[in-house]
């Protein structure tokens, strides 16, 4: 199935966490090109603001906001800004995440374990908690969680990361059932290794064969352009050739 970029998202408001680089930037850029108003968030406020300015320079509507998804007060402030400034959120892409160190589980320090779960799981909960009331009020919305194939298959020396993504998948399926009656769709994308600085298993792989950020952005476009009577709950995204 090919992404249908001929569909206009004019009037739609999209929020992309971790939107300052890599996968998040690719997703934000693609949604803006489809005429959505895009709010990019990230801990590096200067970076997301610069990316937003670059998008505005190309004639798109964008705003960059500093937000740490692991900080409840920061996320609640973002939610209040969205409510006052835009009055709605049609698309939420929970992309912010961390990989953590490559380590056997019994060697992983508790602080690293906590950091992985704060970002990859609790941060998604905070964002959903903040944005869903706006979607319910509007009677529509689409939440897209960026997970990983590591949430389907064990990742040696990355058990904590795998566990966080298994948790994110479970959260996605559960919230999808909770919100179906509210006309809110919830999808999860599980990509394999993507050629970004983030990739926890990038070293030693043939990056030419890895997925690119635009591949994940294509999957997001495919999801948000589905006809309203259906939705795709899960996308498993693999490279054609094994890196």
Language-model features: locations:
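Active-site helix of classical SDR
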Residues: 128, 164
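C-terminal helical subdomain
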Residues: 181-184, 188-189, 196, 205-243
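The beta1-alpha1 cofactor-binding region of Rossmann-like NAD(H)/NADP(H)-dependent oxidoreductases
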Residues: 45-46, 66-78, 110
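Residue(s) in the substrate-gating loop at a strand-loop-helix junction
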Residues: 148
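Conserved glycine-rich cofactor-binding loop
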Residues: 13, 20-21
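Substrate-binding pocket helix/loop in short-chain dehydrogenase/reductase
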Residues: 103-105, 112-114
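Conserved glycine-rich Rossmann-like NAD(P)H-binding loop of the short-chain dehydrogenase/reductase
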Residues: 34-51
């Amino acid at each position: 199935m090919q992404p249908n970029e001929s569909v206009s998202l004019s009037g739609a408001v999209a929020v992309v966490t971790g939107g300052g680089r890599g996968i998040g930037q690719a997703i934000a850029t693609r949604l803006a090109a489809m005429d959505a108003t895009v709010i990019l968030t990230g801990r590096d406020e200067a970076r997301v603001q610069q990316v937003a300015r670059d998008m505005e320079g190309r004639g798109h509507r964008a705003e960059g906001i500093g937000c740490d998804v692991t900080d409840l007060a920061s996320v609640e402030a973002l939610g209040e800004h969205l409510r006052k400034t835009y009055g709605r959120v049609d698309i939420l892409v929970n992309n912010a995440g961390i990989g953590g160190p490559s380590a056997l589980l019994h060697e992983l320090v508790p602080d690293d374990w906590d950091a992985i779960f704060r970002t990859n799981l609790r941060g998604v909960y905070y964002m959903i908690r903040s944005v869903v009331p706006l979607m319910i009020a509007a009677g529509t919305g689409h939440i897209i969680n960026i997970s990983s194939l590591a949430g389907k298959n064990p990742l040696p020396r990355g058990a904590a990361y795998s566990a966080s993504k298994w948790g994110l998948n479970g959260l996605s399926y559960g919230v999808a059932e909770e919100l179906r009656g509210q006309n809110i769709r919830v999808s999860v994308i599980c990509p394999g290794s993507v050629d970004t600085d983030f990739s926890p298993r990038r070293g030693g792989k043939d990056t030419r064969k890895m997925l690119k950020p635009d591949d994940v952005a294509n999957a997001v476009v495919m999801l948000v352009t589905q006809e309203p009577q259906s939705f795709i709950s899960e996308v498993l995204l693999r490279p054609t050739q094994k890196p």
